């Protein structure tokens, strides 16, 4: 009989956040290894308290459910602590062999771990981040940091196994429980990754896709481009000019004088990919702190899958996938002047291994883990 894996987390299927892309790729690996996978994600358009079994749909061949995203204190408390919806799905499914919890809230995680142990179900975690609430309001910061600390330092070490997105997390948890390293993966057979564009050779076309917030340092790229000697265009996907200036008001003069930086606001995933395909390089820069070391950039894997090399700095274990003249350029320094110098010497095209992050490359290692 085919074993059943229940995969639960804050992913918005089929493609509304990075978590959804990761979970679907991982689920395909499990399916290739003879497992049936059931998904329970979130739906921000769903009314809170909607019966979970009535949300059932089929996504890429996977039985999928959703719970509503909370709004207000009472709903948040329920969301962070209750496991009733998950037990409802478990009780209405074939015998569950394993549960995988994706970046899960700690109280609910603890309850599900107890349930799984009592019912002889393997309980794993898929760990893709080490969140920081730095810069948030005091009460939120205390609650969030406490939740993160308990999950990362205590609960994960007691799981039956961990799927981790970075070498940093693999090294951190080694010796506590078995770990499986899976970076951000894609399905190379999907038509959306086909790239028939010819790279521009009259000017360098860059793209940044994301929401910088406190994570991506888009300001470093803007400052660097303001100093370059080459002709360029930068397409910024994910935020508007007004939103960018709310983060970096001192850049108003730079952007007023530079018409080669174009802000497109938020676009669909497929529209964003089209911009990435057309670019000579996709770009992002991050602080090399624990948050960046623990994660693995979805935009990096997706750009490579599009056939577009990446200009970035060395965070996480990105350097494992970039070699001289292939897949991109890793800038050693976070200094905008050094980034400018690198940009001035960039070739219009570079060899890219489009299949580097295809999920099929990891079928064997997942089989050993399971």
Show where each model-derived region lies.
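N-terminal subdomain of nucleotide-sugar transferases
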Residues: 1-52, 60, 161, 223-229
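Conserved donor-binding/catalytic core segment of Leloir-type glycosyltransferases
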Residues: 6-8, 197-216, 221-227, 234-235, ...
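N-terminal strand-loop element at the rim of the active site
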Residues: 14, 35-78, 96, 169-172, ...
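Nucleotide-sugar-dependent
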Residues: 17-18, 216, 268-275, 282-301, ...
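A charged, aromatic-enriched C-terminal amphipathic alpha-helix characteristic of glycosyltransferases
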Residues: 18, 333-340, 344-370
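Membrane-proximal helix-turn-helix segments that form the acceptor-binding/catalytic region
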Residues: 25-28, 84-88, 107-110, 114, ...
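Donor nucleotide-sugar binding/catalytic pocket of nucleotide-sugar-dependent glycosyltransferases
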Residues: 41, 149-194, 200, 209
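Nucleotide-activated donor-binding/catalytic signature segment of Leloir-type glycosyltransferases, i.e.
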Residues: 238, 248-274
């Amino acid at each position: 009989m085919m074993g059943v894996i229940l995969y639960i987390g804050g992913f918005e299927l089929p493609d509304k956040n990075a978590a959804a892309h990761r979970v679907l790729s991982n689920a395909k690996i499990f399916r290739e290894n003879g497992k049936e996978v059931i998904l329970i994600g979130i739906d921000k358009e769903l009314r809170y308290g909607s019966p979970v079994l009535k949300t059932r749909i089929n996504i890429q061949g996977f039985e999928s459910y959703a719970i509503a995203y909370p709004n207000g204190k009472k709903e948040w408390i329920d969301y962070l602590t209750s496991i009733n919806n998950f037990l409802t799905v478990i009780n209405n499914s074939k015998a569950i062999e394993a549960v995988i919890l994706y970046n899960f809230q700690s109280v609910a995680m603890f309850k599900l771990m107890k349930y799984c142990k009592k019912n002889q179900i393997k309980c794993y975690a898929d760990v893709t981040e080490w969140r920081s609430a730095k810069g948030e309001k005091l009460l939120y910061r205390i609650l969030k940091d406490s939740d993160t600390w308990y999950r990362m330092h205590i609960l994960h070490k007691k799981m039956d196994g961990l799927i981790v997105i970075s070498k940093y997390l693999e090294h951190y948890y080694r010796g506590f429980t078995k770990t499986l390293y899976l970076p951000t993966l894609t399905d190379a057979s999907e038509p959306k990754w086909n790239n028939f564009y010819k790279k521009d050779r009259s000017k360098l076309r860059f793209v940044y896709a994301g929401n910088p917030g406190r994570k991506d340092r888009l300001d470093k790229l803007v400052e660097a481009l303001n100093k370059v000697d080459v002709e360029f265009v930068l397409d910024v996907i994910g935020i508007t000019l007004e939103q960018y200036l709310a983060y970096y008001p001192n850049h108003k003069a730079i952007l007023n004088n530079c018409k080669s930086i174009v802000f497109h606001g938020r676009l669909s995933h497929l529209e964003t990919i089209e911009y990435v395909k057309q670019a000579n390089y996709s770009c992002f820069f991050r602080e090399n702190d624990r948050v960046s070391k623990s994660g693995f950039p979805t935009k990096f894997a997706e750009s490579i899958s599009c056939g577009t090399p990446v200009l970035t700095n060395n965070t996480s274990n990105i350097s494992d996938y970039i070699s001289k003249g292939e897949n991109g350029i890793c800038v050693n320094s976070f200094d905008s002047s050094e980034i400018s110098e690198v940009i001035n010497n960039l070739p219009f095209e570079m060899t890219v291994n489009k299949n580097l992050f295809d999920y099929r490359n990891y079928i064997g290692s997942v089989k050993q883990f399971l």
